[in-house]
Amino acid sequence: MKAGIHPAYRPVLFHDTAADVYFLIGSTVDTDRTQVHSDGQTYPYVALDVSSASHPVYTGQQRKTTVEGRVAGFNKRFAGFQATR
């Protein structure tokens, strides 16, 4: 690789503020903030709003709608509009 053109790849401490979980991952993100990790070392720090630890798709806390529920809701909503022949 050509020297001087690639960003610095280093361990970075990501903090999911919603779940209060820390991830130590290699990244090229540029940040001026630092924080001491549980291993006692200081790492560049990035705060995240959502990660796999707090996103509903990954945690299984998402609202699931079933086909039966949608059909029942439709029938309930339009029950009074039945055509009389």
Curated annotation (Swiss-Prot):
<dbReference type="GO" id="GO:0003735">
    <property type="term" value="F:structural constituent of ribosome"/>
</dbReference>
<dbReference type="GO" id="GO:0006412">
    <property type="term" value="P:translation"/>
</dbReference>
<keyword id="KW-0687">Ribonucleoprotein</keyword>
<keyword id="KW-0689">Ribosomal protein</keyword>
<comment type="subunit">
    <text>Part of the 50S ribosomal subunit.</text>
</comment>
<dbReference type="Pfam" id="PF01197">
    <property type="entry name" value="Ribosomal_L31"/>
</dbReference>
<dbReference type="InterPro" id="IPR034704">
    <property type="entry name" value="Ribosomal_bL28/bL31-like_sf"/>
</dbReference>
<dbReference type="InterPro" id="IPR002150">
    <property type="entry name" value="Ribosomal_bL31"/>
</dbReference>
<dbReference type="InterPro" id="IPR027493">
    <property type="entry name" value="Ribosomal_bL31_B"/>
</dbReference>
<protein>
    <recommendedName>
        <fullName>Large ribosomal subunit protein bL31B</fullName>
    </recommendedName>
</protein>
<dbReference type="InterPro" id="IPR042105">
    <property type="entry name" value="Ribosomal_bL31_sf"/>
</dbReference>
<comment type="similarity">
    <text>Belongs to the bacterial ribosomal protein bL31 family. Type B subfamily.</text>
</comment>
<dbReference type="GO" id="GO:0005840">
    <property type="term" value="C:ribosome"/>
</dbReference>
<dbReference type="GO" id="GO:1990904">
    <property type="term" value="C:ribonucleoprotein complex"/>
</dbReference>
